[in-house]
Structure formats: structure tokens, C-alpha cells
């Protein structure tokens, strides 16, 4: 086991303080950790003092999300507040490749609707099949025209005396014709 070093407490945390209260703390440079040790979970390999690196703070996910969101918004507004170049005071000037964004109001980005949308007969909650047919080009039933297919009659069950029911000859199947019509139409 290691021996506690000079000024280390019983937990192994280095808590050495300056001798008088008027002396400023010297800035402690943090050395960059070698790339081999970045995957280590040992706090001393992260380049931080053990007392700082081993602090665990319980936080709810919604609180963490809110903090991250506000930090990102703060960074965004801070970035927007800084002039990016000295010629930004010119009207209509922006850096090449920069995206012009509207000033952030109460609602953020406004969604612009197409003309005519959101007015008239548009109702929420209607499915695609339940929407009114008005306004469609071609009227109801617009689409490819295919001739109606006649399904073959179901197989007849033998009568109780073993004879088939007397029916006329079965009509020929029309499925090959319908397929040909569809192909020629397109």
C-alpha cells in the first residue's frame, strides 16, 4: 500500500492549504493525459485531482435535459451576441456559409404554411380516406382506370347424391386480359 503523502488526509485527498489566508492560490496547470490512459476509469489518470474527479451528483433526467438545453441556448445566444467580423454592422452582410436566422422571438422559428392551407374545409383528425373529395383534380375516383374483374365462381360442392349441380359452363378467367390492359395503359 502507498504511504499518505505530505498534507494528505485519511481518505487520500490532498487538502494542503496555504499557510496564511492572504496568499493567492497558484494556478495549478493540468497536464494533458496520455492518450493511452483516456479509457481508464481511475480519476487520477484523467488529469484531475481525485477529490474533484470522484464527485457523484444525482440528477433527474428531465433536469439534466433542461440544463443541457439552457446551456446550448445560452451558448447560441452568446455566439449571436458576439460580432463575428468587424464589417457585421453593414446591412445584409453575413459571413460566407453562415445561415441567416430570424431574431428569436417568443415562439422561436415560425412555420410558414402554404397559401390556402389551414383555411376552409381542413379539419383535424380526418384520416386520408375520410377527407372530403372536393378540390381534387379529376373528381372522386381519380386514378388509373382498370376494368372490373370478375372473380371465378367458387368450386361447387357435390350434391348429396354424388352428382354436381347442373350449371352452365364456367366463364373463362379474365385476369390475363386485365393484366394486359394495365400494362398497355401505362
Curated annotation (Swiss-Prot):
It holds the Pfam family C19orf84. Residues 13-22 have a biased composition (Polar residues). Its main location: nucleus. One of its GO terms (cellular component) is nucleoplasm. Residues 114-126 have a biased composition (Basic residues). Interacts with SPOCD1. This is piRNA-mediated silencing protein C19orf84. It comes from Homo sapiens (Human).
Amino acid at each position: 500500500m502507498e504511504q499518505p503523502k505530505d498534507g494528505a488526509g485519511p481518505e487520500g485527498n490532498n487538502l494542503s492549504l496555504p499557510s496564511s489566508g492572504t496568499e493567492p492560490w497558484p494556478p495549478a496547470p493540468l497536464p494533458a493525459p496520455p492518450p493511452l490512459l483516456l479509457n481508464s476509469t481511475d480519476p487520477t489518470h484523467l488529469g484531475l485531482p481525485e477529490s474533484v474527479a470522484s464527485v457523484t451528483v444525482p440528477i433527474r433526467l428531465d433536469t439534466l435535459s433542461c440544463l443541457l438545453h439552457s446551456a446550448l441556448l445560452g451558448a447560441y445566444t452568446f455566439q449571436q451576441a458576439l460580432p463575428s467580423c468587424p464589417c457585421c454592422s453593414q446591412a445584409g452582410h453575413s459571413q460566407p456559409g453562415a445561415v441567416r436566422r430570424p431574431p428569436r422571438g417568443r415562439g422561436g422559428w415560425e412555420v410558414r404554411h402554404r397559401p390556402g392551407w389551414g383555411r376552409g374545409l381542413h379539419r383535424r383528425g380526418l384520416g386520408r380516406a375520410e377527407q372530403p373529395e372536393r378540390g381534387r383534380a379529376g373528381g372522386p375516383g381519380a386514378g388509373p382506370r382498370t376494368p372490373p374483374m370478375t372473380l371465378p365462381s367458387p368450386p361447387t360442392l357435390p350434391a348429396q347424391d354424388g352428382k354436381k349441380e347442373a350449371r352452365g359452363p364456367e366463364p373463362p378467367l379474365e385476369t390475363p386480359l386485365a393484366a394486359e390492359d394495365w400494362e398497355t395503359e401505362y
